[in-house]
């Protein structure tokens, strides 16, 4: 078994707890998270629903006295299989009669709470990513203190939007790193393999592939740096188009370069002997995670046509 895919690592409660919780909850969760003593998961996706539209959340939380009672089902919850995972930020519907973007809330749910049932893990391109996992979870009358709600009732969609921008930039940074690793592996292989009396690295076609890969990596790196700079200087909302652009460009670029590296490695490239096949699956998954390409392309198109309004 391989270590968990870094691109699917969603142990990301720390930033939300830091920004949106009480001093007591920071003491309980933030310190051990930052110290690496525990892990966390973000539970939003549900079976049978388009996860790119968070307004469709069906898992419900109802306030009974001083407790929220949660019932529902979550799917593809990355990190929840890790025995170190101790808490989930869970997206729930708290008021179905509110305006669409105010129906959802986010609640801290300790993973050992009675009624939390972690079912089977899912395989991604044949890998189970144990122990990290991508889990199917049932919430059956799960009770947590009302203080576990983040920021306040009806602000779940707002929190989700605020956390996705930085998260997408992090994903794209990792895409660049994996593309760099694939390029290094491709050059090393080309320097060590001789075919028909000639090193692969001396063949013009392959040399051009290496050059093209370098251009693509550096183009994407500059796009990512610009998006990160814009988010830092003018904010997440103002950088929305640039973040959407890199979320499409970076995984595509990484997949292209890893695919070329696989080709240079021959049969070994798709075997367990190298990390390329696993890396390809990881980056291909990112064309779906945190919003599929189509959603981001539509956001980019809207921003472009808005210029002419």
Task: Enumerate the predicted regions with their spans.
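Flexible, glycine-rich active-site loops centered on histidine and acidic residues
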Residues: 15-20, 42-43, 97
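Alpha-helical interface subdomain recognition
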Residues: 20-25, 32, 36, 54, ...
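A short, Trp-centered hydrophobic/proline-enriched beta-strand micro-motif
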Residues: 36-44
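Flexible, small-/acidic-enriched active-site or ligand-binding loops
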Residues: 56, 114-143
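A short core secondary-structure module
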Residues: 67, 71-119
């Amino acid at each position: 078994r391989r270590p968990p895919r870094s691109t699917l690592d969603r142990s990301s409660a720390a930033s939300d707890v830091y920004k949106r919780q009480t001093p007591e909850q920071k003491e309980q969760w933030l310190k051990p998270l930052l110290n690496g003593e525990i892990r966390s998961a973000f539970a939003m996706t549900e079976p049978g629903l388009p996860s790119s539209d968070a307004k469709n959340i069906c898992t419900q939380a109802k306030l009974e006295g001083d407790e929220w009672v949660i019932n529902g089902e979550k799917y593809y919850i990355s990190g929840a299989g890790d025995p170190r995972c101790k808490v989930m930020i869970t997206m729930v519907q708290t008021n179905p009669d509110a305006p669409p973007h105010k129906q959802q809330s986010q609640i801290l749910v300790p993973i050992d709470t009675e009624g939390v049932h972690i079912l089977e893990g899912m395989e991604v391109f044949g890998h189970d990513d144990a122990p990290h996992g991508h889990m199917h979870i049932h919430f059956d009358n799960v009770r947590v203190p009302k203080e576990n709600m983040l920021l306040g009732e009806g602000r779940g969609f707002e929190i989700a939007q605020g956390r996705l921008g930085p998260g997408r930039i992090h994903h794209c940074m990792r895409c660049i790193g994996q593309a760099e690793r694939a390029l290094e592996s491709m050059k090393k292989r080309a320097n060590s393999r001789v075919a028909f009396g000639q090193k692969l690295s001396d063949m013009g076609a392959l040399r051009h592939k290496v050059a093209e890969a370098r251009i693509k990596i550096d183009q994407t790196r500059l796009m990512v740096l610009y998006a990160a700079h814009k988010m830092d200087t003018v904010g997440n909302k103002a950088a929305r188009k640039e973040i959407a652009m890199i979320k499409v460009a970076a995984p595509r670029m990484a997949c292209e370069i890893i695919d070329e590296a696989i080709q240079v490695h021959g049969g070994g490239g798709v075997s367990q002997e190298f990390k390329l096949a696993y890396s390809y699956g990881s980056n291909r998954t990112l064309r779906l995670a945190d919003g599929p390409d189509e959603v981001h392309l539509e956001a980019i198109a809207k921003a472009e046509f808005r210029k002419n309004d």
